[in-house]
């Protein structure tokens, strides 16, 4: 795959807006990658890796806020760690997860990402998802397509559910929706070729956009889990909704996606269950 030039604007392919998002994601990504190396030492010594991860998360969010606010001073900012910060421009908001896949990061598993979405009047118009561990950079802008390191993305074309590999989320034991997730998996396990549970919603969505996964569903997510990923899937030719099939994941917190066929089949199966 091609490489997005580090921190340098790409005149041919990407807008000024995307370049702002990429530059911010890469800078925060370098910080997280350094912290990942430290985590591996802390795992051996058992000296409070969880506290360290919390600090790494907050540090990455502040870096993102600083860079994005400098480039677009009036925009609002909705972040997992710092909550909502109102901007003077009420029509635009960044929706940011500075470290999606915290548990993976805590255990030194290189499946985590920075997720940046930009909403205009409540509709996501651009997204960047960056995994600094493997330098995979996903970008999408409304009407302009989705890309992974400069390569155009398309969702997978399979039209038989029993040939599909799908991902799902599994809430922690004790959460009210844990039992429902297990029930959904039990119903679907005989209908698909396989399940994957990677532990980072933004990357699950990006993997659907890239055709690596045929579908993905999860309930009770937050806007920062979904914002960048949903435009990624749509710009790659996929369909995204809530469990009802025609609802907005940003409003409901539930997401189902895949190509048009897979999305429809998943909705048909999941909707009656919960």
Enumerate the language-model features and the residues they cover:
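N-terminal subdomain of lithium-sensitive/metallo-dependent phosphomonoesterases centered on the IMPase/IPPase/PAP
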Residues: 7-99, 261, 268-271
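Small-residue (primarily alanine) positions within well-ordered alpha-helices
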Residues: 21, 25-28, 127, 146, ...
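DPxDG-like acidic metal-binding loop motif
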Residues: 88-147
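An extended, acidic
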Residues: 154-274
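Short secondary-structure boundary/capping segments
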Residues: 44-45, 69, 84-87, 129, ...
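Residue-level signal for inorganic ion chemistry
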Residues: 32, 57, 68, 102, ...
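Generic detector of well-ordered alpha-helical packing
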Residues: 58, 62, 81, 98-101, ...
